[in-house]
C-alpha cells in the first residue's frame, strides 16, 4: 500500500527539522541498520557471551549484575573490564562499597594502573561522578559497585534511627532517567552491581528482591543473576567455586539462557575450563568417559589435566576457541528486531 505523497513530504520536512535542531541520528527508521548497530564488550567467559546471545554485553546499554554475597558478581564485572581494556578501551570503577582489591583485580587481567577509580562518600556523589565520566564520551565501560552502597546524603547526615523510606529508590530513579541517554550517546557499557534482600511476609513465590527500587529493573537491557552452585576442592583445600549465571532479562536476544563456569580463587574465571566445557558440549572436543580428544590429538584424561594441557598449548586452544565461536556465529553479524547487531570479539 503506497504512502500518500503529501504525508511523505510533511514527514521528511519534520525529520529534517528534528535533525537540524537535535543532531543527526536523533530520529530514524528502525530498519536503518547502520544507525542501529550494537557493538559489544566480551564478558571474558565464552559461555556467558553465548548465553547473552550477541557475544557479550551490549554497548550503550545498562546492565545489572546481582546475586547473593560472594557469588562472583564483582569478578564477572572485573572480567568485563579486563576484556574492554585488552581491546584498547578505557574503564572506570565507582567503588561505593570501598572494597575493591587491586591485587585481585590485577590477577583477573585488569590494567589497574589505567583503571579510573572513585570511592565516593554519598550516593549522589557517586552517580554525579558516573554521569560526568559517561558524558565525556571517553569511557568504554563503567562499573558501579554496588547499588546498595549508594546511600543518599540525607541518610548519611541523619541520625542512626531516622526513617528514610524510599529515598534510595527515588535517587536511583532520578539518576537513571538522566544517565540512560548519555550512556547510549557515549556507546558505553554501564554495569550496576546489586545485592539481594528478602521481602518480609512473602508466603508464596520468590521472596528475593534487589535493592534500590524498581527503576534499575526497567532501565537495564540485560540482567544477570549470579549464583555459586558448588565448591571446587583440591583434596581438602577449597580452590574455587562453580558459578551459574542466568540471563533473566535480555532486550537484545532471547532471555533465560544460562552459563556455568569455574571461578578460581586468586585467578578469576577459568576461561580455558569454560572453553573446554562448551567445546565438549558441541562435540568440537570429543569426550569418551574421562578422556578428551580433539581431531587426532589426545588431550588427556580428566578435566583438570586437560585444562593444564591446553594452558601449555595455546595454539591449539586458540584453534578450538575459533571453532566454538564459528559454531555459535559469534564472529558474524546477527539480526535483532530487524536491526544489524555487530560485535567486537575480544581475544582471550
Swiss-Prot record:
Residues annotated for ATP binding in this entry: 67-74
Keyword Chaperone among record annotations: no
Compartments (UniProt record): Cytoplasm
SUPFAM superfamilies, A to Z: P-loop containing nucleoside triphosphate hydrolases (SSF52540), RecA protein, C-terminal domain (SSF54752)
Swiss-Prot/TrEMBL GO biological process terms: DNA recombination; DNA repair; SOS response
Pfam families, per database record: RecA, RecA_C
Keywords: ATP-binding, Cytoplasm, DNA damage, DNA recombination, DNA repair, DNA-binding, Nucleotide-binding, SOS response
PROSITE patterns to which the protein is assigned, alphabetical: RECA_1 (PS00321), RECA_2 (PS50162), RECA_3 (PS50163)
GO CC annotation terms, alphabetical: cytosol
GO molecular-function term, one example from the UniProt record: ATP hydrolysis activity
Family: Belongs to the RecA family.
Function: Can catalyze the hydrolysis of ATP in the presence of single-stranded DNA, the ATP-dependent uptake of single-stranded DNA by duplex DNA, and the ATP-dependent hybridization of homologous single-stranded DNAs. It interacts with LexA causing its activation and leading to its autocatalytic cleavage.
The protein's name: Protein RecA
Organism annotation: Clostridioides difficile (strain 630) (Peptoclostridium difficile)
Amino acid at each position: 500500500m503506497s504512502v500518500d505523497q503529501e504525508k511523505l513530504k510533511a514527514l521528511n520536512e519534520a525529520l529534517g527539522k528534528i535533525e537540524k535542531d537535535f543532531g543527526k541520528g536523533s530520529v530514524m527508521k528502525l530498519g536503518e541498520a547502520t544507525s542501529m548497530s550494537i557493538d559489544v564488550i566480551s564478558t571474558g567467559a565464552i559461555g556467558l557471551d553465548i548465553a547473552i546471545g550477541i557475544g557479550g554485553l551490549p554497548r550503550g546499554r545498562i546492565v545489572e549484575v546481582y546475586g547473593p554475597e560472594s557469588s562472583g558478581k564483582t569478578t564477572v564485572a572485573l572480567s568485563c573490564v579486563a576484556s574492554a581494556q585488552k581491546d584498547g578501551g578505557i574503564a572506570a570503577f565507582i567503588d561505593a562499597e570501598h572494597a575493591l582489591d587491586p591485587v585481585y583485580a590485577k590477577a583477573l587481567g585488569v590494567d589497574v594502573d589505567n583503571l579510573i577509580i572513585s570511592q565516593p562518600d554519598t550516593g549522589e556523589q557517586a552517580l554525579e561522578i558516573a554521569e560526568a565520566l559517561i558524558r565525556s564520551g571517553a569511557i568504554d565501560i563503567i562499573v558501579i559497585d554496588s547499588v546498595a552502597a549508594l546511600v543518599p546524603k540525607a541518610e548519611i547526615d541523619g541520625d542512626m534511627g531516622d526513617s528514610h523510606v524510599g529515598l534510595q529508590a527515588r535517587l536511583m530513579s532520578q539518576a537513571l532517567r538522566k544517565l540512560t541517554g548519555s550512556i547510549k550517546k557515549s556507546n558505553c557499557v554501564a554495569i550496576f552491581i546489586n545485592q539481594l534482600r528478602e521481602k518480609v511476609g512473602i508466603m508464596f513465590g520468590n521472596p528475593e528482591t534487589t535493592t534500590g527500587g524498581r527503576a534499575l529493573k526497567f532501565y537495564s537491557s540485560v540482567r544477570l543473576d549470579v549464583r555459586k552452585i558448588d565448591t571446587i576442592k583440591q583434596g581438602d583445600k577449597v580452590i574455587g567455586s562453580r558459578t551459574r549465571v542466568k540471563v533473566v532479562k535480555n532486550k537484545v536476544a532471547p532471555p533465560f539462557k544460562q552459563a556455568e563456569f569455574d571461578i578460581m580463587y586468586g585467578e578469576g574465571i577459568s576461561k580455558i575450563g569454560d572453553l573446554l566445557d562448551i567445546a565438549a558440549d558441541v562435540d568440537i572436543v570429543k569426550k569418551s568417559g574421562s578422556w578428551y580428544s580433539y581431531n587426532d590429538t589426545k588431550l588427556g584424561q580428566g578435566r583438570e589435566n586437560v585444562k593444564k594441557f591446553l594452558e601449555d598449548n595455546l595454539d591449539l586452544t586458540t584453534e578450538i576457541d575459533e571453532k566454538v565461536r564459528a559454531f555459535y556465529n559469534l564472529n558474524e553479524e546477527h539480526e535483532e528486531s530487524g536491526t544489524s547487531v555487530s560485535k567486537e570479539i575480544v581475544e582471550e
